[in-house]
A protein has these predicted regions:
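Extended, H/D-rich, highly charged conserved domains that either
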Residues: 157-171
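N-terminal secretory targeting modules
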Residues: 1-132, 136-156
């Protein structure tokens, strides 16, 4: 079942370009989309606008984090493996892992035919905004083998804003 990117049951957070309502564009790290759904099928359709490095989409499904490689241009369809559970209900958070090395347009989502999106609980009134540099965006935060060493050469795979201090503070 196709779900439009602007479905009201999807909660977006972050600084997002919404000039085209049905195709939000994530520019800043930590921009995200979250929803609850039933079933065992989950796909996200995105269009990547690569500036440099390799680009990845972050996903947390039922509290398990993964990353998915994005093509440098054009549409990428990512199928997320959904494990079975007793309730058949799942929580997913897709997020922009990296900084300005790319922008990402959300084209829509898919779940299984006959399945449904489930209303999210109300959003908190609390807000946090952080101004900073690449460290604030989670740059190279997963490069744990290089702690205390000279910066390594990489293609962006060590960047993950989920582990940045602003997102950790917000949680």
């Amino acid at each position: 079942m196709w779900i439009c990117a602007n479905d009201e049951r999807i909660r977006y957070t972050g600084r997002i370009d919404c000039r085209v309502e049905a195709e939000p564009v994530w520019v800043f790290p930590g921009s995200s989309a979250e929803f609850w759904f039933s079933g065992e099928v989950l796909r996200i359709h995105v269009e990547n606008f690569n500036e440099y490095w390799q680009n990845y989409l972050g996903c947390i499904l039922d509290q398990v984090q993964s990353a998915f490689y994005l093509k440098k241009s054009g549409e990428t369809v990512i199928e997320v493996r959904v494990p079975e559970n007793e309730s058949g209900v799942h929580h997913v958070l897709f997020f922009k892992r990296q900084d300005g090395c790319h922008e990402l347009k959300i084209l829509g989502f898919e779940i299984g035919d006959g399945e449904r999106l489930i209303e999210l609980p109300p959003v908190s009134e609390r807000r946090i905004e952080v101004y900073g540099d690449s460290v604030s965006a989670g740059e190279s935060v997963e490069a744990i083998d290089f702690i205390g060493k000279t910066d390594m050469e990489h293609e962006g795979g060590f960047s993950n804003c989920w582990f940045s201090f602003p997102w950790m503070t917000a949680r």
